[in-house]
Amino acid sequence: MDQSAIESPREPAASRPGGDASAAGGAATRRSFEQQAGLFSGPGAVFGRSFLSVLEWLEPLSPDWIALDVACGAAHVAQEIAPRVRQVVGIDLTPALLRLGAARLAAAGIGNVLLQEGDAAALPFTDGAFDLVVCRAALHHFPDPAVQVAEMARVCRPGGRVVVSDMLAPSAAGRTAFDALHRVIDPSHARCLLDDEMSDLITTHVGAITHRTRPGLTYTLPTEAFLTGAGQPDAAMAALRAELAGGPRTGFRPASTGTVITVTFDRAIMASSRER
């Protein structure tokens, strides 16, 4: 692939309106995920689990396509897409995760994935450069996700697809507590959207929703799968145990089986065909 055909110089975050805050947020995200790198590697890693529920919304794929994985982390989704398309580009703020992804791709003998450091708020690509743009589990890290979704739409060709997957807030009333505990766990967390907010965002900036998961899609995790030194794991566990004992609700829906505490989150996957 001729890389110059898709790359385009973009202003660094700090030089854009409101960019100081954006750059500071990016630095916080980078620091947080450097401490969470273990969640992306190894057979039990929470972000290394099966992505089939996302991939089914990406089909049908074409062997001629060029795809972009936004906030790609350690490139798990990019790795799944790669055999079905001509080229995948993965972009992420955190070099430590990109290195993990590059090592795993090399070990798997996958040569059509290009990983690069970059900001989802200012994607360094030309308009309409990609046939498919996918973003998994990242919107809740963006203070104003409309910026990133608009960028995804910009770099997707007319008629191409944008597919977004993320966890959702449990309710409008429960969002404040839910986001607050997420920030205790991961300081880079910004705000979770409601289902209708996510669909409105995509419809406004990309086009009509063509596929979406039914309300009620959830995933359940044991707490040890995602608590790291990036946040305050002891404080997080205290809040979950307090809820189990009848205390304030966190929105995490904790459950206890023996010594194991699990949490359950709502999530959504939405696909749209770029109209503008």
Q: Which residues fall in each region the model found?
A:
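Conserved class I S-adenosyl-L-methionine
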Residues: D2-S62, H76-E80, L97-L100, V163-D186, T223-L227
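Class I SAM-dependent methyltransferase SAM/SAH-binding core
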Residues: L68, A74-A122
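Conserved Class I S-adenosyl-L-methionine
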Residues: A74, A208-R276
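A short acidic, Gly/Pro-enriched loop at the edge of an enzyme's catalytic core
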Residues: A121-L132
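A short SAM/SAH-binding and catalytic strip from SAM-dependent methyltransferases
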Residues: L132-P143
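A short glycine-rich, Lys/Arg-flanked "PGG" loop and its adjoining helix->strand segment in the class I
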Residues: A146-P158
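Short alpha-helix
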Residues: R191-V206
